[in-house]
Amino acid sequence: KTSIIFSIKHEPGSLHRIIENFHNYNVNLTKIESRPTKTNTWEYNFYVDFEGHAKNSRIAEMLEKINHETLFMKILGSYPSAKLN
C-alpha cells in the first residue's frame, strides 16, 4: 500500500488526468480525500492511498507520470497491507 499527496491546477479535467493513470496501470485506489490549500483559493491537496509499493517498477513508472502532471507530488509512505483479524 502507498500513500501520496498531490496538488493540481484548478481547471477542468485536471483530476481526471491524474486518476486516469491509476486506471491505465490497473492500480486500485483505496482512498481519496481533498483538503483546501492554505495558499490559494480553489486549490486543493489530494491525499490518495492505493494498492502497490512505490519500489515496484510499474508503480514507480506510474508515480513518475503523476509527478509530471501535478503542481507537486510527495510519497507519504509505502508499506505492506495489514490484514485485520
Regions found by a protein language model. Give the residues of each.
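A conserved regulatory-domain signal marking ACT and ACT-like small-molecule sensing domains
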Residues: 1-85
